[in-house]
């Protein structure tokens, strides 16, 4: 915590290393965030804003009526149903938006962009493939 409370200042011996590490981490997070948001916005029924000061994004998802009906038949909130299907199909964990007090009739999920940069393409591909299959199944 000391480093966060009092980071090295310009002129101190550790400043250059600290600044390079910090900028490298932040740059990587920005790149992963942009890549994920861009990919999510290409998916049917998903709208995702850029992350602002967080390590997650919170896309909205328009679920087909048949998916909503299947969720209700299973006794689950529609976004929970989607999140569980995603987990079971891909191993990817997202948090259903219904736990955050979303507006009635809207659906969201929260997902991070913390996987290593080298893994992001694979995560995005698995998520995109699942989403296309899910939408096709319930459309």
Where are these regions (language model features)?
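PLP-dependent class I/II
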Residues: 1-139
């Amino acid at each position: 915590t000391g480093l966060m409370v009092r980071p090295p200042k310009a002129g101190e011996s550790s400043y250059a290393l600290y600044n390079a590490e910090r900028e490298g981490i932040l740059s990587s997070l920005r790149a992963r965030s942009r890549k994920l948001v861009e990919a999510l916005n290409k998916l049917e029924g998903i709208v995702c804003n850029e992350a602002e000061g967080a390590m997650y994004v919170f896309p909205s998802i328009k679920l087909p009526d048949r998916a909503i009906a299947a969720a209700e038949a299973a006794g689950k909130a529609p976004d929970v149903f989607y999140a569980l299907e995603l987990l079971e199909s891909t191993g990817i964990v997202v948090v259903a938006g219904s736990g955050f007090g979303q507006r009635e009739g809207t659906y969201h999920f929260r997902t991070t962009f913390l996987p290593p940069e080298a893994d992001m393409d694979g995560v995005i591909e698995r998520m995109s493939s699942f989403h296309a299959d899910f939408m096709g199944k319930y459309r």
